[in-house]
Amino acid sequence: MEVIITKGQIEDIEIIAQFQVDMAMESEGAILDKETVTNGVTAAMNDENKGLYYVAKVDGKTVGSLMLTREWSDWNNGWYWWIQSVYVAPEYRRQGIYKSMYHAVCADAKEQNVAQVRLYVDKTNIRGQKVYSS
């Protein structure tokens, strides 16, 4: 299985928004308004200062995504990149999709001399914490 990782594009907005709705329900039991989420994803797509998406594709199908936000660190005189809003379609889990996205983020971070890459996981998302620690 070949996994292709790219930065999210306008044509990915709908699937990313659906992934976010699904992720919120699975991880936090939260019901999100799809239109609001779609508008939020669109806003980030149009302004990288709000966020940047990476998507994973298998055979042309988008099977996962994550959002990257940036935080300035005066301690390190550099940027921290925060990985958040990670979602992989259930049928593609435990196949290295997240790992592929993570490696793509880290490669880009290295090219841009980012101080640290960090992963945000909600404290109530016990399942996510277990996945990321493995």
Q: Could you tell me what each predicted segment is?
A:
Residues G78-P90:
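Conserved acetyl-CoA binding element of GNAT-fold acetyltransferases
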Residues V21-T42:
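Conserved GNAT-fold acetyl-CoA-binding loop/helix
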Residues V55, K61-R70, Y87:
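Conserved beta-strand in the GNAT
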Residues V88, R94-A107, S133-S134:
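Conserved acetyl-CoA-binding loop-helix of GNAT-fold acetyltransferases
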Residues A43-V55:
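A short helix-loop-beta-strand connector motif used in the catalytic cores of GNAT acetyltransferases and
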Residues V3-Q18:
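A short beta-loop-alpha structural element at the N-terminal edge
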Residues A109-Y120:
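Conserved GNAT acetyl-CoA-binding A-motif
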